[in-house]
Amino acid sequence: MANGNSFGVLFCVTTYGESHGGAVGVVVDGCPPRLPLSEADIQAELDRRRPGQSHITTPRQEADRCQILSGVFQGFTLGTPIHILVRNQDARPQDYSEMATTFRPSHADATYQAKYGIRNWQGGGRASARETIGRVAAGAIAKKILRLAAGVEILAYVQRVQDVEAQVDPSSVTAEQVEANIVRCPDPAAAAAMIEKIEAAAREGDSLGGVVECVARNVPRGLGCPVFDKLEADLAKAVMSLPASKGFEIGSGFAGTYLTGKQHNDEFYMTPSGWRTRSNRSGGIQGGISNGEDIVLRVAFKPTATIRQPQSTVTLDGQETVLAARGRHDPCVLPRAVPMVEAMVALVLCDHLLRHHAQCRSLALPEVPIPAVPLPHS
């Protein structure tokens, strides 16, 4: 845990591998036994993340076929560590020869060198987005646990590319709408404009950033552990650990700072099935604990750092120079970031679901009686 390659408390994932190494993968420890699981379950998510899926993503061609090496027997999980492997097949280390001695601006090259005194400069090594294969594979397992155990649905989509913003209702958006176009934006008009923007940036050897929005529906009440493991804090850490992420907000986010308390508060009301809130500016979390409403969050992603435009930089021996990077890179990370965000949200919710049941649901203790307190005057 101290080296930053593992994530989670009870549902713990450890990813490994580099961009141009032999393979990448993940070990998942803490998955409950008897979960139906196949390579097809995982492959469906990896196919959404893989490179080369459209003309607005990196042209690197990787099938990203997964192998389950342990932890599953006759189609069911054993409760033991699950090892998932994906072999790299289309590595071109020669495209990165300049990076052996030259730092890419705004990439991890310089900081990895400063920290470790050595780095794998082929495609970014551990800092490459190929590391997220392990996250998405583990997220596929977490998604299945959440769906079967609690009916939780997690859906992300591209909400903005540069200045093109989609008009989307998180409460009603569907997976079919998201997957209807290559940019994964459920607003068709905005999607067309986004694609044009990305195509133009790619022609110029440049890149664009934007925002991915994610909604988690049917999340049980009670997930989250005050005070340092609040649900939104763990969600923020999870998505902010993704490559190129630069910002996080949940519910009303920064826009909520323009409101008064009266305007911002989510008032309660009763339904036959229990209490609900009339609005959802809290984004489904209050006091660090899920309240049963949709969890709605947004993640900002910067423009891809590796571009073909000439940029000023320095070398390992301290010489100033100019670099126009080669290699194959996404002109915009947003379309492929969608399954990555879903995976990280799933990992957090699955971990907290297991933690909640371990602390609050595992023992048959008596309910605390409701005190007889007079209602306040309206």
Curated annotation (Swiss-Prot):
InterPro entries: Chorismate_synth (IPR000453), Chorismate_synth_AroC_sf (IPR035904), Chorismate_synthase_CS (IPR020541). It comes from the Bacteria. It holds the Pfam family Chorismate_synt. It catalyses: 5-O-(1-carboxyvinyl)-3-phosphoshikimate = chorismate + phosphate. Keywords: Amino-acid biosynthesis, Aromatic amino acid biosynthesis, FAD, Flavoprotein, FMN, Lyase, NADP. Pathway: Metabolic intermediate biosynthesis; chorismate biosynthesis; chorismate from D-erythrose 4-phosphate and phosphoenolpyruvate: step 7/7. PROSITE patterns: CHORISMATE_SYNTHASE_1, CHORISMATE_SYNTHASE_2, CHORISMATE_SYNTHASE_3. Its EC number is 4.2.3.5. The keyword Chaperone does not apply. This reaction introduces a second double bond into the aromatic ring system. Belongs to the chorismate synthase family. This is Chorismate synthase. The gene is aroC.
